[in-house]
Amino acid sequence: MVAPRLVVGLLAVALAAVLTGCTGGGRESTCDSANGIVECGPEQRSDPPKITGELLTGGSYDVADQRGQVVVVNFWGSWCAPCRAEADDLEGTYQATKDSGVTFLGINVQDSRDKAIAFEEGRVSYPSIFDPGSRLALDMDIPPNTIPATVVLDREGRIAVVIRAAVRQEGLQPIVERIAAESPAPSGQR
């Protein structure tokens, strides 16, 4: 029974890493966590993560170019059954929220480019970064064994929500709409 204890231990470490990432500049604050969702209030969010890379279809992407937009980042792989199950819900949420200053980005991990492109074709209309080595996932404390995972960045690019499970539109859309409705922090306050 070592394996279940190892999994629980890894999940605890991953959650601690996410909570640490959501704390701000030495403040003694924590984020709210329930049912695999960690949500950080505006005053609890840390500096924006650096998310850059090559798109599956060619060209480059830098999430910093999206400041002013809420960015929903979904980590996925073509080999991941829950990723296949959530694709329609992600696309539905994207279509329902894109006119309110929301954009989506997929990050494909541990995959071949051909398999990733074939998986994405006809499923989602937003771009995906190709990250076969899972560098971006690991930089954001998303171990590949926790895929799928979805991260919602606020309009300043800070991590507002981390979801470590497959998402459904009825759960994700209200979260995205709530973050999109936030007022930007006054200059100099983070």
Stretches found by the model and what they are:
Residues A118-S125, D131-R190:
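Thiol/disulfide oxidoreductase modules built on the thioredoxin-like
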Residues R84-R123, P132-D139:
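Structural microenvironment flanking redox-active thiols in thiol-disulfide oxidoreductases
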Residues P49, V71, I147-P148:
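Short loop/turn microsegments at loop-to-beta-strand junctions
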Residues G9-G21, V71, V109, I129-F130, ...:
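Hydrophobic alpha-helical membrane segments, chiefly transmembrane helices and signal peptide h-regions
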Residues M1-E54, E182-R190:
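N-terminal targeting signals for export/organelle localization
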Residues Y61-R84, L90:
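Short active-site neighborhood of thiol/selenol oxidoreductases, capturing the structured segment around
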Residues T57-G59, E156:
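Residue-level recognition of short loop/turn positions
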